[in-house]
């Protein structure tokens, strides 16, 4: 088994101010990749720029990444960074800016367009990336993946290579406290999905399972408190750590059927990734439960469920019910139809999901018809 994680992880309240010192290890001019407004509004952008300047690192801000990074975002970002002579990347925000930054970094050292690397591995490592997550969800600060939307084909491309793992991950839970309840819930359910899918993954190892279970434990304890009170520092700290742990886990034991099914929902109907996962998670887990009930018993225990006296089967059911209960408590929408999904598109969604690489990681390999049935059950 191969285990991967970022070389350097800096953790703690206020650590965002260390970005300048870290960037100076790799270069003299940074491209700061971020979203279209939230980082500036929160004041975090100014903190990052100030830290860079104090360390003698100049900065060009690329703030054009949307909620789902597109091929254009990446190609244009690489051109912007090249024009500005950037030699290090700082990515700050949710999973979208972090994923875009990985694609940008890869193009700066390998050339071409991002679509060139959909099925072809890049020869060179990305430009050094320093990742600063402001949401507790994707764990992109720890992974070898970048999900980019190709709007011409209505698909989400998965880039997968060790060369885009960030060199430094900076985890400052204080900068996540302003995240609104909906985003807290959706990104938190994304992290929970990562943790669960990596644990039941056919490629899971003792190391990845350790990270997965701890992520499940922390999320079960702290997601709802973070949704209800964004200023709850302990909950925010737990969630940011959980997202990191789950990201480390999926870096070596990747996502499975939930992600195969959620990506087409994002590509065709622009449903936020975390929300799509939240709607699918308990239903897909019920589908998977019979294939590895012992692992589901472990999940139930990690979630704090009392399984004493229960059979393995009963314990596995308790796990699925606990997952569904957390999704209910977040208040997130449950039905695909509420997000604009049309029933006539389900066969296309199912074919796209079946063809996705994550499906092969699932403990129970589905048919296209079974995937259609799952979609229809939450329509």
Where are these predicted regions, by residue range?
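Glycine-rich phosphate/pyrophosphate-binding beta-alpha loops
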Residues: 137, 244-277, 356-360
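Short glycine/serine/threonine-rich phosphate/pyrophosphate-binding segments
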Residues: 16-19, 41-44, 71-73, 96-102, ...
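Short, amphipathic C-terminal "tail helix"
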Residues: 342-379
């Amino acid at each position: 088994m191969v285990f991967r994680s970022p070389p350097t992880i800096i953790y703690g309240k206020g650590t965002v101010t260390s970005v300048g010192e870290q960037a100076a290890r790799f270069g003299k001019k940074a491209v700061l990749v971020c979203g279209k407004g939230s980082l500036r509004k929160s004041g975090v952008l100014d903190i990052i720029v100030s830290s860079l300047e104090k360390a003698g690192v100049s900065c060009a801000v690329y703030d054009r990444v949307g909620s789902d990074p597109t091929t254009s975002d990446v190609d244009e970002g690489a051109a912007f960074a090249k024009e500005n002579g950037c030699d290090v990347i700082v990515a700050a925000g949710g999973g979208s800016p972090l994923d875009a930054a990985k694609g940008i970094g890869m193009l700066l050292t390998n050339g071409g367009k991002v679509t060139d690397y959909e099925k072809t591995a890049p020869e060179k490592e990305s430009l050094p990336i320093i990742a600063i997550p402001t949401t507790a969800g994707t764990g992109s600060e720890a992974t070898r993946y970048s999900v980019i939307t190709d709007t011409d084909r209505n698909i989400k491309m998965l880039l997968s290579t060790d060369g885009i793992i960030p060199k430094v991950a900076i985890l400052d839970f204080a900068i996540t406290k302003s995240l609104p309840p909906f985003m807290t819930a959706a990104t938190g359910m994304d992290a929970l999905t990562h943790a669960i899918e990596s644990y039941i993954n056919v490629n899971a190892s003792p190391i990845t399972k350790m990270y997965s279970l701890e992520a499940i434990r922390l999320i079960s304890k702290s997601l709802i408190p973070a949704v209800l009170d964004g200023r709850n520092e302990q909950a925010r700290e737990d969630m940011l750590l959980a997202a990191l742990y789950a990201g480390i886990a999926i870096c070596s034991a990747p996502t499975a059927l939930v992600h195969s099914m959620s990506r087409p929902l994002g590509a065709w109907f622009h449903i936020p990734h975390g929300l799509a996962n939240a709607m699918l998670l308990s239903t897909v887990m019920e589908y998977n439960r019979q294939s590895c009930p012992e692992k589901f018993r472990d999940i139930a225990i990690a979630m704090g469920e009392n399984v004493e006296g229960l059979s393995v089967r009963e314990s596995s059911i308790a796990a699925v019910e606990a997952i569904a209960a957390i999704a209910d408590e977040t208040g997130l929408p449950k039905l695909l139809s509420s997000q604009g999904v049309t029933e006539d598109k389900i066969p296309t969604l199912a074919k796209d999901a079946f063809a996705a690489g994550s499906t092969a990681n699932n403990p129970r390999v589905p048919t296209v018809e079974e995937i259609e049935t799952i979609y229809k059950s939450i329509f």
